[in-house]
Amino acid sequence: MTNEDVGTNSVADRLQLGPREGVTYPIQMKYCGHCTMPIEYCEYYPEYEKCKEWLELHMPDDFERLKIEEEAAAADGTDDDKKRQKRGGKGLLRVKKKEDVPKRICVSRAARGKKKSVTVVTGLSTFDIDLKVAAKFFGTKFACGSSVTGDDEIVIQGDVKDDLFDVIPEKWAEIDEDVIEDLGDQKRT
């Protein structure tokens, strides 16, 4: 058998190197603003209806072309709902919504032993501040031990409560001095 018998002409056409006829280079891709994928792949996204709304507002000419293609596919009966995932698998990752908790920072002093005390800072996580970074900052700023002890609690060794009213707004500009609340002396639990 020779190569001509197998049909190498069609294989050679498919494996042609270089630019193809009828294609303009460089290729410009259009991306959806909702799902951030190329608009050809929006139909495979679980929230396809929202992608269509975005396309209608921002790319009306592409939306019209998409609508014509959908109508043609519906007329052929090739749609068959096979594109959307109905059950199983991971599906779409849901973004957790931020709870609307009041943004305030509470600073208190608690006794530790006979003559020693600790300063407890709570509420920094409502401002999306990394507590580990904040604890490290307080430890270096006040030359003392500082650690994250709870979900939203930093314990600083020593009585530095008065200094925190100046240090926190200075370090994090998004925190105003008015949202820092002094709870006074507390009993540690």
Curated annotation (Swiss-Prot):
<dbReference type="InterPro" id="IPR046447">
    <property type="entry name" value="DENR_C"/>
</dbReference>
<comment type="subunit">
    <text>Interacts with MCTS1.</text>
</comment>
<dbReference type="GO" id="GO:0001731">
    <property type="term" value="P:formation of translation preinitiation complex"/>
</dbReference>
<keyword id="KW-0810">Translation regulation</keyword>
<dbReference type="InterPro" id="IPR048517">
    <property type="entry name" value="DENR_N"/>
</dbReference>
<dbReference type="GO" id="GO:0048027">
    <property type="term" value="F:mRNA 5'-UTR binding"/>
</dbReference>
<comment type="function">
    <text>Regulates translation as part of a complex with MCTS1. Specifically required for translational re-initiation in mRNAs containing upstream open reading frames (uORFs). Not required for standard translational initiation. Regulates expression of a subset of gene products including mbc, InR and EcR.</text>
</comment>
<dbReference type="Pfam" id="PF01253">
    <property type="entry name" value="SUI1"/>
</dbReference>
<dbReference type="GO" id="GO:0006417">
    <property type="term" value="P:regulation of translation"/>
</dbReference>
<dbReference type="InterPro" id="IPR001950">
    <property type="entry name" value="SUI1"/>
</dbReference>
<dbReference type="GO" id="GO:0003743">
    <property type="term" value="F:translation initiation factor activity"/>
</dbReference>
<dbReference type="GO" id="GO:0002188">
    <property type="term" value="P:translation reinitiation"/>
</dbReference>
<dbReference type="GO" id="GO:0046628">
    <property type="term" value="P:positive regulation of insulin receptor signaling pathway"/>
</dbReference>
<dbReference type="InterPro" id="IPR050318">
    <property type="entry name" value="DENR/SUI1_TIF"/>
</dbReference>
<dbReference type="GO" id="GO:0032991">
    <property type="term" value="C:protein-containing complex"/>
</dbReference>
<dbReference type="InterPro" id="IPR036877">
    <property type="entry name" value="SUI1_dom_sf"/>
</dbReference>
<dbReference type="InterPro" id="IPR005873">
    <property type="entry name" value="DENR_eukaryotes"/>
</dbReference>
<feature type="domain" description="SUI1">
    <location>
        <begin position="105"/>
        <end position="172"/>
    </location>
</feature>
<protein>
    <recommendedName>
        <fullName>Density-regulated protein homolog</fullName>
    </recommendedName>
</protein>
<dbReference type="Pfam" id="PF21023">
    <property type="entry name" value="DENR_N"/>
</dbReference>
<dbReference type="GO" id="GO:0120142">
    <property type="term" value="P:positive regulation of ecdysone receptor signaling pathway"/>
</dbReference>
<comment type="similarity">
    <text>Belongs to the DENR family.</text>
</comment>
